[in-house]
Amino acid sequence: MADLTGKERVMKMFKKEPIDRMPCFSGQGTVTVQAIEKMETQFAKIHNDAKLMAGAAVTSARMWGLDGLAIPYDMAIVAEAMGRGVSLYDSAEGIIYPTVPNKWKDLDEIDIPGNYMSQGRMPVVDKAFDILKNDAPDLAIGAWVLGPFTLAGQIMELDILLKGLKKKKDQIEAFLGQVTQVTIDLCEHYESLGVDFITVREMGSGTDLLSPRMWKTLIQPNLTKVFDAISIPSVNHICGSTDMIIEMMHECGADALSVDQKNDVAETRKKLGDDVLIFGNFDPYGTLTTMEDIGEVENVIKQCVDNGVDAVWPGCDIWPDVKQENMEAYVRTVKEYGIKASPAVGRI
């Protein structure tokens, strides 16, 4: 039998169909400095140029032997399109992600424009997806969006948002309803562009910040609406502490759950059973950038597999300045150790 392409491997996994080995990919940023250097460009330039954005994704995926890729790379794109501006740090030599300089400071200021989808760098991302479909038909192409609560924290000051939960609860809930519709519209837009899967990153909603009770009333209903609207494979990603909300995360209706190193994945597997796709859950910076011993990298990845994940995902974006030998060890270990079946996905 012919080898599966990366795209075939990932898409079969989402359907829980038998595959030859565990896929090695992420629904979050996997661009690395080695790829950027090969392209003879800079990290600061790949956020505002469709060819460079797509090229960095494909070059990184092919350089390391990944089965998929995902764009964009920064969290400021939607806020910028809504008129909040962006700091791109164009002249920076190192790794600095774009940020939002002019967040709304009061609920009464908020005015989401109707044409944001065509503003700022949104068309750049659209063009990058078109390029990826032509240049990487053999790879699973992922888009990611921020969850409603996390997106809200990009377009207005988070501390004002949190304070408003007590003093202006109805107004905050109405605002989150607006932002939920934005998230849904973005997902439907990326679907229309032909992406293979979507990761919804409600990163700022772990129990480090919100109580499980607040998560159930403030986060879960809106995430459920988002996943109800997605008709292609979807991933519910939350970093930080998620042990106490993992069942509620599952109830939101995504095809897979993604968690970071703070989650007790072995216990999560027991709670949810073997039929749920679980991705995770290594510390990307600690494992790929600072870890000195290749054997330790291999052990971290093997532990993820042994704990019951169906795909070994980093807990967040891979920090671009990875050590080559660590990245190689990560990919190699997933492919070799992931030959055995995972709880939700059998092997051919």
PLM feature segments, named:
Residues A44-A54, R62-W64:
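Short, structured active-site "lid" loops
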Residues H47-N48, Y73, C239:
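Active-site nucleophile and cofactor-binding loops and adjacent substrate-binding regions
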Residues K38, S60-D74:
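Active-site loop/lid in soluble adenylation, ligation, and acyl-transfer enzymes
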Residues P72-N115, D138:
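A contiguous, low-structure linker/loop signature
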Residues N48-K51, N102-E109, Q119, E292-D293:
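Intrinsic-disorder/low-complexity, polar/charged segments
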Residues M1-Q34, M39, F43, A56, ...:
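Active-site loop segments of alpha/beta catalytic cores
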